[in-house]
């Protein structure tokens, strides 16, 4: 497409560009940029547009001879955005008047083409082909055109470095013809290239190798476009469809494969119907196909006149009608017929596979089951299609698909042809691209209607894919690590299916060496919805065939005695990754069978179990599975106990909260019930843990809030590990063939952990917190000398003050001292802020904002702790004063009699001072002289005991009472 300097990016008609310098296409017949590598037949089927113009405003006939050119009009975009590149052949631009002066400008789509005076255009064309070097287009002016939103378009380059020179737009397209208005002057004859020129054009096209891929968006469309009824436009569109049908009907029948496979119906349908069918199939092609058919890339530019807009409107309406009809068609026979045609496609194109790489893969329904096409969903109501907006995202970076082709080769060239890999090499700009390595064929297939078709098509292959154990590269991911990237069954391909494909398609077998290996795609919401329904219809089959995957495909439903919130908090699941050894075992059982039904696979597994095909590797795998589940259960939080304890009103038996009634698991894959021995070990382990916990709570006074999490962790090895869950979901050796029964969770009552009441637990909790907050032990043993000295000095001064003054005086002086300090500091800060003119605010703002409110729960805790001691004191006083025990009451009497003498010598404050001195001195002295002190204390104790025995011997009443 030629462009003027006034409207460089404009593919529209411009009548104000007469002052621009002429420009023409660079690179003649052999130029790589002259024509995309689309094949001789493909280019032959897409003839160029012809625009004949002169200095005067004469009517010009504009008619597209490219079938795919009009197909762009039937896309979902408005007509203003749906424009194609106009490829003009040098044989179409003529200057019939030999007297035309050099420099006279001829307007064609906003570009001036200067014709040589007195020269034959075809002679100049041949001369230009021979003189122009190949691959030397340095000055390129690539005008972006829009086929649909973001569709890559290939067009020739335009050098703009030939001012004031005769130039000709050339393009190797095959039979380029010119259409002229009937009432035009006879001086504008029609010229058609003869056989020599056509063969030269075909020979030149075989050298074209460079393909420029553009990522286009609506923002790149030019603004300078002619309005619908612009009076300034010198062009008039006259569409002669009858002549078009008469001239090109044979051409459609010659090239059925280049038109995307829909031309197979050419014998019984008119070219207009074929054109409409191609228009409907083209916009609905999915993004995985890589590129679009070669014939679609050749089009023309429209002048946006009334006739063209009416044609566009008609095509768009027909497209919508056809889209509604195609969803109800049964295209299964058509898909098979198109798959059989692929064997002769490459030969008909005449391309050299060693030089040209096709960027349009051959789509096969058998090997690409997850290919997203315009199909009906499973409920038959919602069509699943790919919009053209997604194509824009795939090409936003503007990178040629050939670059991705090389990365695909590196990723998939080393594996087995049937292996399935995660395609991590593809960048984010092409999330769902499937690229084929070689060949130039394009076969458009439509996924058959999946409604009620489980025995065939994709459903049958899903079962084969997951159940065959032959794919060594199958990626198995953990649910907890990547919950959104699970490999679905529909994204895997069986090796057996790939091996069947080359036998049916000989051409693809040659291309299979480099790039036929499919790559696993990232999931999209549409694909997830498809795969979710597929997986929901085959939950039992997939999990029975691969028993080592514990509910990997379906949503895992963990049957446990613990509440569901625990599993949600911890993020763990009973998902055990498949072992390579177990996969190899399954592979040995399945590799001889070629059946596609799950019943055949289950029969093979059952037969293998009956024959006793169990060896050492199986035992090792089972041990690994057991250890995996044991590790998982060891990590279960035991904070469940505390949560259920708080939820109950009174908990005398903490563990009894976790014994649940018998129930059977529903949904998900069936699992094996644990062995009787394993159940006994589980119950025994839980009982031992409960008894041990009760002893620890009673001896150490551990609170139920924080310590239970650590002490209740299982410590009895892998067999009895954890089995806090009331059952064990462990796969044993009999899983391979024996039919599975649902797991039954038995009601198990566990002994009480502790006989302590809730009040006692709270009391111990408060005391433990007080001891931890105030390290009295470290304080009285002088671990921190500064801290101990400060506390000891302050308390001693206060006690001495109380000894010298009254309590009221001491309290008053203390309050006055504190207020003097705070008020002085407050005034000082206010003066400093006034002098410095700063706004630091209140100096005690941080302390004022401290929340010291006592909650009702904390108050109740403290009161409960205090009431325990008050109740004990009241009970003791009643026992002593009511003489429940005479000896105890006598002891109290003797003690009080001795205290009368002490009170006569010392008052209460003096006793407190003495007590403080003893508290801060005796522990440290005892720590230093522990051995000697213990020796002398032992001697004193023995002497005291002997004296008491002598006294009791002399008092017979007391002796009898003690004997009783």
Curated annotation (Swiss-Prot):
GO cellular component assignments: endoplasmic reticulum; endoplasmic reticulum membrane; Golgi apparatus; Golgi membrane; synapse
Location of the region described as Disordered in the Swiss-Prot/TrEMBL record: 1-32, 68-109, 179-200, 479-536, 645-674, 697-723
Positions of modified residues (N-acetylalanine): 2
Stretches assigned to the Reticulon domain: 776-964
Membrane topology of this protein: Multi-pass membrane protein
Location of the region described as Interaction with FADD in the Swiss-Prot/TrEMBL record: 919-964
Keyword Endoplasmic reticulum carried by entry: yes
Cytoplasmic membrane side: 2-795, 820-876, 900-903, 927-964
Intramembrane stretch boundaries: 796-819, 877-899, 904-926
Pfam families from the UniProt entry: Reticulon (PF02453)
Composition bias, Basic and acidic residues: 493-511
PTM-bearing positions, type Phosphoserine: 31, 217, 225, 230, 233, 270, 303, 429, 529, 596-597, 673
Expressing tissues: Isoform 1, isoform 3, isoform 4 and isoform 5 are expressed in spinal cord. Isoform 1 is present in brain, where it is expressed in the neurons of cerebral cortex, hippocampus, hypothalamus and cerebellum (at protein level).
One GO process term, biological-process aspect: vesicle-mediated transport
Modified residues annotated as Phosphothreonine in this record: 593
Protein location: Endoplasmic reticulum membrane; Golgi apparatus membrane
Major localisation: endoplasmic reticulum
Keyword Membrane: yes
Biased composition (Polar residues): 712-723
Quaternary organization: Homodimer. Interacts with RTN4. Isoform 3 interacts with BACE1, BACE2, BCL2 and FADD. Interacts with ATL1 and ATL2. Isoform 3 interacts with TMEM33. Interacts with ZFYVE27 and with KIF5A in a ZFYVE27-dependent manner. Interacts with RIGI. Interacts with TRIM25.
The protein's role, per its UniProt record: May be involved in membrane trafficking in the early secretory pathway. Inhibits BACE1 activity and amyloid precursor protein processing. May induce caspase-8 cascade and apoptosis. May favor BCL2 translocation to the mitochondria upon endoplasmic reticulum stress. Induces the formation of endoplasmic reticulum tubules. Also acts as an inflammation-resolving regulator by interacting with both TRIM25 and RIGI, subsequently impairing RIGI 'Lys-63'-linked polyubiquitination leading to IRF3 and NF-kappa-B inhibition.
Protein name: Reticulon-3
Source organism per UniProt: Mus musculus
């Amino acid at each position: 497409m030629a462009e003027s300097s006034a409207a460089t990016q404009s593919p529209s008609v411009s009548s104000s560009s007469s002052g621009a310098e002429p420009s023409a296409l660079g690179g003649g017949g052999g130029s790589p940029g002259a024509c995309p590598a689309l094949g001789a037949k493909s280019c032959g089927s897409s003839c160029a547009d012809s625009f004949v113009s002169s200095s005067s405003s004469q009517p010009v006939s504009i008619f597209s001879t490219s079938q795919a050119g009009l197909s762009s009009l039937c896309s979902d975009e408005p007509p203003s955005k749906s424009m194609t590149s106009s490829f003009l052949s040098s044989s179409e631009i003529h200057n019939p008047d030999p007297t035309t002066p050099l420099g006279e400008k001829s307007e064609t789509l906003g570009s001036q083409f200067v014709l040589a005076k007195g020269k034959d255009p075809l002679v100049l064309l041949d001369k230009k082909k021979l003189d122009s070097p190949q691959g030397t287009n340095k000055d390129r002016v690539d005008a972006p055109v829009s086929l649909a939103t973001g569709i890559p378009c290939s067009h020739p380059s335009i050098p703009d470095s030939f001012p004031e020179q005769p130039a000709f737009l050339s393009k190797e397209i095959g039979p380029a013809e010119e259409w002229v208005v009937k009432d035009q002057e006879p001086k504008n004859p029609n010229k058609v290239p003869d056989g020599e020129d056509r063969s030269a054009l075909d020979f030149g096209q075989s050298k074209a190798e460079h393909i420029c891929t553009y990522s286009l968006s609506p923002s790149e469309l030019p603004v300078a476009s002619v309005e619908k009824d612009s009076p300034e436009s010198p062009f008039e569109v006259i569409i002669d469809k009858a002549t078009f049908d008469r001239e090109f009907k044979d051409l459609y029948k010659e090239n059925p494969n280049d038109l995307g496979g829909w031309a197979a119906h050419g014998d019984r349908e008119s070219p207009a119907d074929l054109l409409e069918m191609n228009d409907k199939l083209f916009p609905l092609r999915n993004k995985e196909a890589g590129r679009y058919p070669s014939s679609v890339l050749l089009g023309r530019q429209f002048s946006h006149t009334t006739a063209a807009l009416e044609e566009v409107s008609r095509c768009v309406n027909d497209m919508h009608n056809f889209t509604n009809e195609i969803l109800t068609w049964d295209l299964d026979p058509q898909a098979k017929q198109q798959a059989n045609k692929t064997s002769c496609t490459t030969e008909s194109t005449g391309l050299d596979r060693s030089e040209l790489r096709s960027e349009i893969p051959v789509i096969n329904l058998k090997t690409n089951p997850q290919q997203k096409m315009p199909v009906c969903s499973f409920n038959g109501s919602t069509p699943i299609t790919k919009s053209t907006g997604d194509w824009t995202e795939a090409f936003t970076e503007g990178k040629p698909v050939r670059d991705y082709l090389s990365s695909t080769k590196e990723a998939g060239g080393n594996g087995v042809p049937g292996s399935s890999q995660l395609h991590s090499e593809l960048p984010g700009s092409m999330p769902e691209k499937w690229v084929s390595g070689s060949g130039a064929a394009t076969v458009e297939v439509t996924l058959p209607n999946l409604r009620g078709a489980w025995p065939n098509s994709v459903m049958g292959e899903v079962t084969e894919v997951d159940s065959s154990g032959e794919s060594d590269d199958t990626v198995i991911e953990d649910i907890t690590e990547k919950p959104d990237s699970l490999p679905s069954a529909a994204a895997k391909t069986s090796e057996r299916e790939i091996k069947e494909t080359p036998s049916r398609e000989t051409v693809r077998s040659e291309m299979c060496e480099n790039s036929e290996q499919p790559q696993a795609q990232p999931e999209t919401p549409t694909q997830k919805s498809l795969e979710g329904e597929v997986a929901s219809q085959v939950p039992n089959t997939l999990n029975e065939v691969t028993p080592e995957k514990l509910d990997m495909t379906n949503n895992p439903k963990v049957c446990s005695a613990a509440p569901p919130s625990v599993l949600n908090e911890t993020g763990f699941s009973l998902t055990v990754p498949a072992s390579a050894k177990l996969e190899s075992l399954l592979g040995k059982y399945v590799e001889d069978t070629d059946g596609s039904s799950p019943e055949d696979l289950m029969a093979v597994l059952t037969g293998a179990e009956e024959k006793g095909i169990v060896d050492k590797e199986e035992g090792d795998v089972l041990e690994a599975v057991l250890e995996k589940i044991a590790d998982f259960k060891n990590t279960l939080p035991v904070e469940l106990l505390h949560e259920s304890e708080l939820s109950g009103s009174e908990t005398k038996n903490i563990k009894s909260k976790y014994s649940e009634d018998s129930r059977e698991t529903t949904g998900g894959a069936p699992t094996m019930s644990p062995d009787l021995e394993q159940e006994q070990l589980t119950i025994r382990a839980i009982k031992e843990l409960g008894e041990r916990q009760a002893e620890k709570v009673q001896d150490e006074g551990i609170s139920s809030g924080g310590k239970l999490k650590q002490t209740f962790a299982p410590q009895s090895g892998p067999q009895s590990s954890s089995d806090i869950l009331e059952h064990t979901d462990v796969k044993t050796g009999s899983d391979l063939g024996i039919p599975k029964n649902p797991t039954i969770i038995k009601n198990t009552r566990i002994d009480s952990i502790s006989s302590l009441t809730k009040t006692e637990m709270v009391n111990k909790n408060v005391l433990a917190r007080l001891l931890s907050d105030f390290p009295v032990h470290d304080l009285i043993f002088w671990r921190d000398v500064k801290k101990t000295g400060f506390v000891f000095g302050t308390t001693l001064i206060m006690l001495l003050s109380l000894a010298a003054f009254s309590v009221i005086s001491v309290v008053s002086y203390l309050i006055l001292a504190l207020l003097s300090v705070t008020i002085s500091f407050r005034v000082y800060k206010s003066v400093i802020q006034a002098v410095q003119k700063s706004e630091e605010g209140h100096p005690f703002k941080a302390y004022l904002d401290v929340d010291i409110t006592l909650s009702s729960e904390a108050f109740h805790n403290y009161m409960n702790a205090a009431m325990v001691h008050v109740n004990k004191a009241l009970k003791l006083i009643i026992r002593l004063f009511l003489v429940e025990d005479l000896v105890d009451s006598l002891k109290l009497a003797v003690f009080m009699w001795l205290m009368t003498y002490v009170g006569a010598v010392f008052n209460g404050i003096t006793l407190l001072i003495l007590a403080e001195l003893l508290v801060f001195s005796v522990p440290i002295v005892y720590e230093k002289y522990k051995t000697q002190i213990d020796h002398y204390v032992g001697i004193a104790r023995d002497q005291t005991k002997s004296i008491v025995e002598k006294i009791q011997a002399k008092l017979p009443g007391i002796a009898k009472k003690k004997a009783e």
